[in-house]
């Protein structure tokens, strides 16, 4: 059978349909054709190429506040008790929502919105580690930039503090004042610089200093600032800066955790300082300027230290060298031997530190190995009342609740961009909403 006439007929019909559709679009654009309910269909079909182009461009240029969601990602929710989580993310207007939501139900309990017309920031900037106050206001900051700010329960700006660069973490002390990881600005402008140096073999090594600051929650006024380099120098600990593999950023302060009560090993008002690149946590007493204890051992690029009891701390141990996530073996030119010593496969995990015995106990070893939990930077844990732990695997954007021998929760913050979820910004677990 000769199919040529059929093919010609089909081609003519397709061309006729395209011609008719083109004519309809032309006159819809000119505004002299009304198809009633058909207008919506025609307009959507005509706009599809623009929509497709926009989607491709969007996928190629998404801010780094979004993370690709793996194909086949399978959430888990076995929670039997409510877990309230506070975190910030980018909304469809590229403003920042700060949501308090229930991990068990997925319900949003309260939402604050930081609008870009109120506080100007670029689309890839992150609103970090929000802190809930008793009057339902929140304090947060643009990480690595100024300011620290407070929003009331209706998202109105209460105050802003622009005199320091805020980064990583903020926490409340027993008096309700805010402790923050900061860097000081140079005089004359809002920028930071190498504020410390040491000499070695005729060379001068300039490096970044960090500081800790205490902020009044009602006014945002700075009450106290202390250089971390000065803390080391005044306590005979200058040698610690030589431990780091990054000579320009040897400290990298990433948490300041106040002790809310006194115990046999610390006093109320002590602060525990986590330094990623020192591979150590320092117990510092601001009232006397004394470093009470240097906590090191099987810690590597750790983040987040919490006081669990009067004798125990918990620390999020990233268990990585600071640059392994950035470089691969191709950075080195040595050949690979056929006979290699094999060390363990490392995963990020929570570790308990006993202040009495100076010993470390890793938690959830089998679970983190089974689920390959790993974040080269950032990451945190929060102990929950039932003995389980909330864990933020920050680089992948996966949120976990780990029981003693089972995963109770695993999910991501779904975004309005298909195939992508939100990068978490140091989620805080809240015991109750005021």
Predicted feature locations:
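Positively charged n-region of N-terminal signal peptides that target proteins for export
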Residues: 1-5
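Histidine-/acidic-rich catalytic cores in large beta-rich domains
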Residues: 6-434
């Amino acid at each position: 059978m000769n199919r040529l006439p059929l093919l010609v007929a089909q081609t003519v019909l397709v061309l006729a349909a395209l011609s008719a559709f083109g004519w309809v679009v032309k006159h819809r654009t000119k505004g002299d054709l009304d198809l009633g309910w058909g207008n919506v269909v025609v307009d959507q079909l005509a706009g599809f190429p623009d929509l497709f182009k926009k989607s491709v461009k969007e996928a190629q240029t998404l801010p780094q506040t979004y993370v690709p969601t793996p194909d086949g990602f399978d959430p888990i929710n076995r929670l039997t008790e409510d877990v309230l989580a506070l975190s910030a993310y980018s909304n469809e207007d590229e403003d920042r929502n700060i949501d308090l939501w229930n991990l068990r139900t997925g319900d949003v309990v309260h939402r604050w919105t930081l609008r870009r017309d109120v506080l100007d920031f670029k689309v890839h900037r992150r609103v970090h580690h929000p802190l809930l106050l008793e009057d339902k206001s929140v304090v947060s900051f643009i990480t690595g930039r100024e300011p620290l700010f407070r929003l009331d329960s209706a998202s109105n700006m209460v105050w802003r503090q622009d005199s320091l660069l805020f980064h990583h973490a903020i926490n409340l002390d027993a008096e309700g004042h805010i402790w923050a990881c900061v860097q000081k600005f140079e005089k004359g402008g809002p920028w930071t610089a190498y504020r410390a140096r040491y000499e070695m073999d005729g060379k001068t090594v300039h490096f970044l200093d960090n500081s800790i600051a205490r902020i009044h929650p009602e006014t945002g006024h700075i009450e106290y600032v202390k250089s971390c380099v000065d803390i080391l120098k005044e306590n005979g600990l200058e040698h610690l800066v030589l431990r780091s593999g990054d000579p320009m950023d040897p400290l990298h302060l990433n948490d300041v955790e106040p002790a809310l009560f006194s115990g046999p090993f610390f006093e109320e008002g002590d602060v525990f300082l986590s330094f990623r690149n020192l591979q150590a946590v320092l117990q510092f007493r601001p009232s006397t300027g004394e470093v009470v204890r240097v906590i090191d051992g099987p810690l590597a690029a750790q983040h987040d230290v919490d006081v669990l009891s009067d004798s125990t701390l918990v620390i999020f141990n990233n268990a990585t060298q600071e640059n392994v996530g950035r470089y691969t073996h191709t950075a080195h030119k040595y050949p690979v031997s056929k006979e290699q010593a094999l060390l363990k496969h490392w995963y990020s995990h929570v570790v308990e530190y006993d202040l009495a015995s100076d010993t470390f106990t890793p938690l959830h070893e089998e679970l983190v190995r089974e689920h390959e939990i790993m974040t080269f930077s950032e990451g945190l844990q929060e102990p929950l009342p039932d003995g389980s732990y909330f864990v933020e695997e920050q680089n992948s954007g996966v949120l976990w609740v780990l029981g003693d021998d089972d995963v109770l929760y695993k999910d991501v913050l779904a975004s309005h961009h298909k195939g992508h979820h939100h990068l978490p910004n140091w989620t805080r677990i809240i015991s109750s909403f005021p």
